[in-house]
């Protein structure tokens, strides 16, 4: 469901930056950020409506309706692990450390946070996947916090900022390609909601694509445009 939304978002951003314009000046970065926020909200609203109405399949419809009924929001209901993560952050702000095995108190605190948003925590997912001898919080940033504490959390936020800023920079210059828009959006999603063991390589690839494209675009836009006069072969030199 989310991948369809990211493809649609990338298409909207590409079409927007190729709109006719009467000026060649770059757009303000804050305005571009506002545009992305509005586009995300619009796509989320439209996507939720399509899912609830069953236009994207009956199975997706049933799951979406159930998640909204349980938590009141598709995003919160679809990824309830953050509710458990926030509960753990309140109990242990500095994280847990590499190789730490969750205690029964840790599991109870996470379950309490997830139950607060209407999530069923007695289906084996929390006990076996999330806390079965390890911390798997289904978020790269959250997993980095649990494993490496504040330093890991800060590194995750830096990667998130790099992706967002690089995308905004290229959109303001009208140099963002469809792949850059797609990979940047996927990278941000994986940092927030993707398991670290599966999606960290995807985030590294997204960073490589977006930062390389941003550096190349900056070098192109800042290169001198004045042509150098080359004397014709055989021509006389001018004083």
Feature names for model-found ranges:
Residues 69-76, 80, 94-148, 167:
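Long extracytoplasmic/lumenal interhelical loops at the membrane interface
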Residues 11-28, 163-175, 215-227:
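Cytoplasmic membrane-interface segments at the C-terminal ends of transmembrane helices
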Residues 11-14, 178-191, 195-234, 239:
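Transmembrane alpha-helices of multi-pass inner-membrane enzymes
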Residues 131-139, 143-147, 155-193:
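Loop-to-helix entry and N-terminal half of a specific, functionally important transmembrane alpha helix
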Residues 56, 61-77, 96-103, 153, ...:
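C-terminal/domain-terminus segments
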Residues 5-13, 36, 40, 151-161, ...:
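Lipid-exposed faces of alpha-helical membrane segments in multi-pass integral membrane proteins
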């Amino acid at each position: 469901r989310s991948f369809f939304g990211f493809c649609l978002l990338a298409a909207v951003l590409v079409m927007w930056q190729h709109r006719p314009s009467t000026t060649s000046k770059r757009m303000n970065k804050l305005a571009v950020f506002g545009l992305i926020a509005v586009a995300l909200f619009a796509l989320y609203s439209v996507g939720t409506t399509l899912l609830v109405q069953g236009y994207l399949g009956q199975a997706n419809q049933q799951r979406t309706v159930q998640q909204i009924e349980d938590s009141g929001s598709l995003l919160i209901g679809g990824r309830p692990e953050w509710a458990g993560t926030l509960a753990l952050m309140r109990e242990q702000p500095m994280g847990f450390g590499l190789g730490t095995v969750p205690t029964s108190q840790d599991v109870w605190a996470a379950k309490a946070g997830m139950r607060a948003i209407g999530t069923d925590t007695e289906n084996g997912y929390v006990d076996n996947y999330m806390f079965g001898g390890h911390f798997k919080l289904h978020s790269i940033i959250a997993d980095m916090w649990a494993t490496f504490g504040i330093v890991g959390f800060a590194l995750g936020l830096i990667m998130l900022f790099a992706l967002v800023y690089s995308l905004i920079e290229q959109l303001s210059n009208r140099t963002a390609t469809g792949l850059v828009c797609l990979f940047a959006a996927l990278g941000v999603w994986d940092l927030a909601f993707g398991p670290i063991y599966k999606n960290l390589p995807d985030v590294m690839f997204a960073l490589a694509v977006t930062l390389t494209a941003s550096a190349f675009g900056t070098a192109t836009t800042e290169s001198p445009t004045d042509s150098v006069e080359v004397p014709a072969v055989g021509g006389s030199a001018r004083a």
